[in-house]
């Protein structure tokens, strides 16, 4: 139950669990399976990214207006567990603390995969979202230091931290921080290989973690792949960043434009054009040299993650 700073009318709508990452680790599929369980109510949109848009703890009125009323309006007292799935929460600083401020008993689900497979997919996703203007992943990786100094930031990028690829992939650091803040008993870490090989068993373990009954679900399709645009120039015309006093603001306002106050999804001509402009696209394979460079860069963190989980994941960074 969320902490007492929220009144009972609002506290039931604060999420009991959060699927916090990692990006491009099949969290969309997992959230879809959880949404189909009648005892679970998932936020609309799936990824509000509410707690990364500010560096402070929001007031109660602000939280209610911009988060609870907008993302969980469709949830009722009949739902046993409310959740959301913002994958930025795992690596963005200060987010877990802000969540725990409102619900000290919040549960966190993390799904991880080999970062050498995750990073190219994540880079392509950033291009799809018009946050990244470098088509070549090796170039984007090499620009990290300069981007941390505020250089070479794409003009449509809502948050430069999205482009700090090495930070996004530091799973060991992220899991250690999550364990320290929330505790191991409030955290469930899933390895993608387990999820892929035994989806039903993984799903049932998650329901047990959430204290939710199994709903008999057995069809666990995974139909979502990477996408890009037929005409990038068209998508740039359709995408107009939300601004405040001339400055680009967080992604929540962008996402909420797509939803009605009751949580139902709008349909506009720009969204219809966007759907027509999408095409399947696979990430470019890593060159042998880039793969070796990533292995060396990520090996210490993966060793650290292995120790935290009591599971050898060295094959992720071994040749």
What are these model-predicted stretches?
Residues 12, 49, 155, 159-160, ...:
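Short, contiguous pre-domain boundary segments
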Residues 61-76, 132-219, 240, 245:
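PAPS-dependent sulfotransferase catalytic domain
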Residues 31-35, 52, 100, 120, ...:
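Non-transmembrane alpha-helical segments in soluble domains
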């Amino acid at each position: 139950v969320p902490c007492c700073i929220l009144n009972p009318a609002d506290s039931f709508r604060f999420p009991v669990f959060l699927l916090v990452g990692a990006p491009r680790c099949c969290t969309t599929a997992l959230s879809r399976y959880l949404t189909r369980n009648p005892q679970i109510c998932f936020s609309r949109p799936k990824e509000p990214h509410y707690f990364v848009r500010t560096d402070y703890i929001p007031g109660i009125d602000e939280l209610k207006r911009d988060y609870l009323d907008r993302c969980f309006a469709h949830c009722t007292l009949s739902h046993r567990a409310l959740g959301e799935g913002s994958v930025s929460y795992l690596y963005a600083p200060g987010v877990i603390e802000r969540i725990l401020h409102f619900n000290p008993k919040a549960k966190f689900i993390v799904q991880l995969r080999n970062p050498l497979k995750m990073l190219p997919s994540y880079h392509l996703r950033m291009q799809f979202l018009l946050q990244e203007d470098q088509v070549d992943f090796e170039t984007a990786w090499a620009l990290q230091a300069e981007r941390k100094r505020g250089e070479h930031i794409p003009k449509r990028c809502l948050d430069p931290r999205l482009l700090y690829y090495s930070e996004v992939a530091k799973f060991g650091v992220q899991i250690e921080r999550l364990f320290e803040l929330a505790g191991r008993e409030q955290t469930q870490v899933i390895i993608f290989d387990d999820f892929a090989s035994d989806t039903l068993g993984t799903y049932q373990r998650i329901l047990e973690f959430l204290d939710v009954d199994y709903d008999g679900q057995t069809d666990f399709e995974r139909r979502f792949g990477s996408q890009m645009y037929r005409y990038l120039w068209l998508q740039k015309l359709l995408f107009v960043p939300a601004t405040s006093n001339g400055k680009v603001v967080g992604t929540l306002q962008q996402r909420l434009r797509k939803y009605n106050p009751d949580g139902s999804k709008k349909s506009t001509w720009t969204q219809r054009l966007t759907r027509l402009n999408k095409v399947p696209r696979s990430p470019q394979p890593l060159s042998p040299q880039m793969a070796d460079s990533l292995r060396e860069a990520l090996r210490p963190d993966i060793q650290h993650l292995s120790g935290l989980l009591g599971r050898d994941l060295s094959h992720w960074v071994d040749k």
